[in-house]
Amino acid sequence: RHAGSAHTF
């Protein structure tokens, strides 16, 4: 889960 990702894992 990264705040810059388009798809959060």
Swiss-Prot record:
GO terms for biological process: D-xylose metabolic process. Its main location: cytoplasm. Belongs to the xylose isomerase family. It is found in: Cytoplasm. Keywords: Carbohydrate metabolism, Cytoplasm, Isomerase, Magnesium, Metal-binding, Xylose metabolism. Binds 2 magnesium ions per subunit. Homotetramer. Its EC number is 5.3.1.5. It catalyses: alpha-D-xylose = alpha-D-xylulofuranose. It comes from Streptomyces sp. (strain NCL 82-5-1). This is Xylose isomerase. Involved in D-xylose catabolism.
